[in-house]
Amino acid sequence: MVSWKDIYLVLEATVPLYVAMILAYLSIKWWKLFTPEQCSGINKFVAKFSIPLLSFQVISTTDPYDMNIKLIYSDILQKSLALLGFAAISKACCAEKFDWLITGFSLSTLPNTLIVGIPLLKGMYGEQAGKLLSQIVVLQSLIWYTLLLFLFELRAANGMATTTSSETTGLIWALVGFRWHIRLPLIVSNSIRMLSDGGLGMAMFSLGLFTALQTKIIACGAKRMLLALAIRFFLGPALMGMSSYAIGMRGVLLKIAIVQAALPQGIVPFVFAKEYNVQADILSTAIIVGMMVAVPVALAYYFAMIIPAIK
């Protein structure tokens, strides 16, 4: 059962992100500290340095020999269904075909597992949930962010990105390190940690700068906002639920998979969308509004799945 202490732990993890975003917003709206060109430079730093190093740190510190196979298969199936579905819809209905394929995939399958998910679901389902969500974070960083970057690069036709190599390096080191119990030299790990620890904070700072440069906070408009929230909080969990059930997941493991899919939008896809100028307004709105309703939505899914058990 979720306690007030568990909710406080979630707020403890998420409020600092909002502090970074609000400071960035005020630095543009009130203090006029940055020009649009400088804001673009900050976002490029986040995309090319902070996020790749954060991905390396997450992947290299997770044991690849202790993964839940059913969770991996269900995650792959969910993403595959989302890709195929949005590819078909985008081709049939949307003028910006590739843009909506990328945005729809990001909204439906890439939640904020690291910051919001782990503390919240540990309160709901215990330490087991934290361990499982760490594996999902690795899959996100290693496979799905790489695929997302590939889609962005395919759209831009501009070559490969630095994040791909950092994730591959992180996986190689994790395979070697956990197999033979080798640790990175402290001077190397501290150098990586210095930049990676600020990765999410800098991403939220970039989000605040982007929001401040828009004429209104809901930059994409009310209709697109509602569509984005519906994809994030309804379609994403539905796809994950169907995929997990089809793979054979039951009980607590199935519930964890569904609730983590109903978490608010991840920050990293926005950083990439801003860097490649692909519907960043939709993702920024999904993050801002989604973070505000994260706890109520997760609790709604949690209680909805325990009511049948009580009956």
From Swiss-Prot:
Keywords: Auxin signaling pathway, Membrane, Transmembrane, Transmembrane helix, Transport. It holds the Pfam family Mem_trans. It is found in: Membrane. GO terms for biological process: auxin export across the plasma membrane; auxin polar transport; auxin-activated signaling pathway. It is a multi-pass membrane protein. Expressed in shoot apex and panicles. (indol-3-yl)acetate binds at residues 51, 112, 114, 145, 267-268. Its main location: membrane. One of its GO terms (cellular component) is cell periphery. Residues 1-6, 60-68, 122-131, 189-191, 248-251, 308-311 are extracellular. The chain crosses the membrane at residues 7-27, 39-59, 69-89, 101-121, 132-152, 168-188, 192-212, 227-247, 252-272, 287-307. One of its GO terms (molecular function) is identical protein binding. The keyword Transmembrane helix applies. Belongs to the auxin efflux carrier (TC 2.A.69.1) family. May act as a component of the auxin efflux carrier. PANTHER family: AUXIN EFFLUX CARRIER COMPONENT 1B-RELATED, AUXIN EFFLUX CARRIER COMPONENT 8. This is Probable auxin efflux carrier component 8. The lineage of its organism: Eukaryota, Viridiplantae, Streptophyta, Embryophyta, Tracheophyta.
